[in-house]
Amino acid sequence: AGEDIGAPCRVAGIEMDLAVEHLRTMAVEVPQVEGKSPYGTVAAIFPYDAPAVMLARVGGAAILGGNRFRFSFSSQTPRTARLMAEVVAPFPEFEAVVGMDNHHFGEQCVRDPLVRVLFISGGGEVGAVYAREAHAFDKLFFAGPSGLPPVILFRDAPLKEAVPFVVRRAFLNGGQYCTTLKRAYIHRDIFAEARKLILAQMAEIRVGDPGDPLTWIGPIRVERTRALLDRALAALDGAKFLVPYRREGEWQGPFLVETPEPPDLELFGPFLALTPAASDGEAVTRVLQSRYPFLVSFFGAPPPGTKEKFQETFGMVYDNPDFLFTPLRLPFGGRGESGWILEQRDGQTVKRDGAFNYSAELVRN
């Protein structure tokens, strides 16, 4: 992962540990599939980030449900692809497709009547292309852009717990997960103290050799990610950069900015915007306007009815979270432009969105 995309070795190691532990404990999900039948072949095109986690989450659920699992890799991760193909080679239910362009792999899945379920990810244009082919599958899953996932620090937020989460979740793996934070709306009464603590916490966020266990941000080797960073930084208006950063080819960030209004764009990479909010209600209102309602986190007590509004609007809602890596058994998925499922029911294509459980989705009721 370090050689392919610049992922820090510590992060890649934790991903592997999470994946292995998830697969070892799949027995807890047996009730989700008991008495149900498999679809046949489940296929997936892995993104460049966290392929081991994808293999465990999607592949583990597919196999548990009695399906065959066929998967391909991002062109950005050739070394990872070869290694993972070797790992699954002894298990005939897993079929790793190495060296095939993802466009051709996707076309092959559309034409193959054995492939009943397909997982894809990418920008909205990718989702639109496959949506036109939804009739070829029983289910089509699309993980779209997560945009700039927000976190709110309400007026009574416990800063001792909130600040480490905000900083580490923003810059984990160089901000190259769809679940990494990009915007923090902070009540103005605690903004100065929160900013002070965030700046102190930033001392641990190092840019450097991915082989160094202290590195948080390795080289950003994916050109598209760097282009998204450039676009977001160019869109900033009235922003103040709070820490020194790098913009030298593959070496990027960390970009910690204070701004009255972060750009609402698709973004990957080491970026976090701090924005003061006049009240808890204002922070909620601004977050609810997100273009990509993928994930929202908050600390402190929200105004009455807020959590319900978040659950209606966003795919995932984290209430005073206490983890660094997202637990793999939490339901996963966005809403609106950030993700959907197209399913064939009684001859009709039905669209739905929101977080889902993989094992429950990969068997027929």
Region roles according to the model:
Residues 110-114, 155-159, 220, 255, ...:
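Short, surface-exposed amphipathic charged segments that create phosphate/polyanion-binding patches used
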